[in-house]
From Swiss-Prot:
One of its GO terms (molecular function) is metal ion binding. Gene3D superfamilies: Glutaredoxin. Belongs to the glutaredoxin family. CGFS subfamily. PROSITE patterns: GLUTAREDOXIN_2. Pfam families: Glutaredoxin. This is Monothiol glutaredoxin-S7, chloroplastic.
């Protein structure tokens, strides 16, 4: 057995004058760490006070063409869900959950697949100051992501908001 161990060590030992390759961590320089996002709570409804937080706007800014496009999409439908996949074939559990909630409330809604367009996906993150998907818009305003939608559904706030939107 000792001979086997010696043979395996010899098999991985470098040739005389050669050195073992450096580990990847020694070859790849570390990227500078980005500062963590700053979160601020918005005030307003009970939903906003208890669960909704918005990322503080970072630098860069949204291209005017993208802002105009998103304004048009969000403003032209009472309920819009930006999601991963489609309402008939959601590509993530969070998107599926919000679709199921909206269907259970028998609300007409439009969906846009953010996986089909990288520029749309990145633009929406800036537009809403919300980093994840799905993103639900009701009556032209950002309502929230999956967790906020679920909480609002359980409390009855989502139903109230949707009823008001459908009547306006």
């Amino acid at each position: 057995m000792a001979a086997t161990a010696a043979a395996s060590v010899a098999a991985i030992s470098p040739l005389p004058g050669a050195s073992l390759p450096r580990p990847v961590s020694a070859r790849v320089p570390l990227l500078p760490r980005a500062s963590p996002p700053t979160w601020r709570l918005s005030v307003g409804s009970a939903r906003a006070r208890s669960t909704r937080c918005l990322a503080a706007a970072g630098g860069g800014g949204l291209a005017p063409e993208m802002r105009a496009t998103l304004d048009k999409v969000v403003g032209s439908h009472k309920v819009v869900l930006f999601m991963k996949g489609t309402k008939d074939f959601p590509q993530c559990g969070f998107s599926h959950t919000v679709v199921q909630i909206l269907r259970s409330l028998d609300v007409p809604f439009e969906t846009l697949d953010v996986l089909a367009n990288e520029a749309l996906r990145q633009g929406l993150k800036e537009y809403s100051s919300w980093p994840t998907f799905p993103q639900l818009y009701i009556d032209g305003e950002f309502f929230g992501g999956c967790d906020i939608t679920v909480d609002a559904y359980k409390s009855g706030e989502l139903q109230e908001t949707l009823e008001k939107a459908m009547l306006s």
